[in-house]
């Protein structure tokens, strides 16, 4: 028995007021439907079927890296009709998990609980109890057992009082699902083929029906407009903030961070306001992150201080380093232990050695910088000739004077000193002093120009 998922993503989403298909709107930096696809993968689904309609070409472009079966629903005739389009991809002995492309926050643990409750030859429904169930299909029970689902528009006044509602997410045996889908009717207030009708069919055939519930109602909320989308974003970010705090991070304001990927932190981490985490971020112990920083796909060692407005992307920062304010580490930047990068310093594809410092106004690209090197303010590695990139190598304990230009490819030896304002184009040997600038001239009697 294998797991097959069917993800419904055919809706146009007119209330979004957007040319973008609804399921391509993002929560936490990732499209809603990608959240759902990732969940299916994490559950070990052997087949993922994505039922699409509106904006199919754009969907396929943006989700091209996913291994899914693309299933067209040419006419939107209801959820039952949508699932039926995937029948040819469903085996009789499969467990079929039905998910929704605009319901991105369902936790893997919740779906695992639903699957664990699914009878081998039966049906399990994910339900939730709501204080205000308006708009949802109500779960019908007799002596505690599920017997059916009634949609809001078809419900009686008594049934509208029921607080347990259908989330739409269910798991069912493949053979039974295909049988029931073939017998659906559209004789209802909506004139649609309701997937929910299979619950009553199961009951009438004596098939076992079970249910499970999520840990939080927001797990099963969808987004039909941008207000609801913002609500999903805030719920997700609140959960991420709680997880960070439980793992040893102090947040200056839990409502003012954004996690758009995964963050792993050590103990005693301090995170100030408006910090954004993207991709995979790993943070060690005793790290301080100032306000308005962006960390993307990076590793931060223990006892690091990251000052305000610093950007770190695809970079590695070892223990005891200090960055910022207004520093930028671009892809391939590596700071070794106890190195410093200060305000308005940018690094790309550069290794800054242990104990080295670039504290002010520098660009360091395609460089290997040794230990205990001082990079003076305004220093630039001139690594690009308009076509190719070249490398700058600086030995241990070198001193680079302020406002120097190091024209790559160039090698600066250990203990070498570069005079301020120099343009270095040739190798400087170990312990040499290099000065490459115009000779100063002082002119007596010079008169400033005057306005005519």
Curated annotation (Swiss-Prot):
Query: Which subcellular locations apply to this protein?
Result: Cytoplasm
Per its UniProt record, the required cofactor names are: Mg(2+)
* Catalytic EC class: transferase
Residues that bind acetyl-CoA, according to the entry? Answer: 377, 383-384, 402, 420, 437
- Cofactor annotation remark: Binds 1 Mg(2+) ion per subunit.
Alphabetical UniProt keywords: Acyltransferase, Cell shape, Cell wall biogenesis/degradation, Cytoplasm, Magnesium, Metal-binding, Multifunctional enzyme, Nucleotidyltransferase, Peptidoglycan synthesis, Repeat, Transferase
Q: Show which residues constitute the signal peptide.
A: none
| Pfam families on file | Hexapep (PF00132), Hexapep_2 (PF14602), NTP_transf_3 (PF12804)
In the UniProt record, which is one GO cellular component term? cytoplasm
In the record, biological process GO terms are: cell morphogenesis; cell wall organization; lipid A biosynthetic process; peptidoglycan biosynthetic process; regulation of cell shape; UDP-N-acetylglucosamine biosynthetic process
Which residue positions are annotated as catalytic? 360
Q: Where is this region: N-acetyltransferase?
A: 248-452
Per UniProt, subunit arrangement is: Homotrimer.
Do you know which PANTHER family this protein is assigned to?
A: BIFUNCTIONAL PROTEIN GLMU, NUCLEOTIDYL TRANSFERASE
The protein depicted here goes by the name Bifunctional protein GlmU
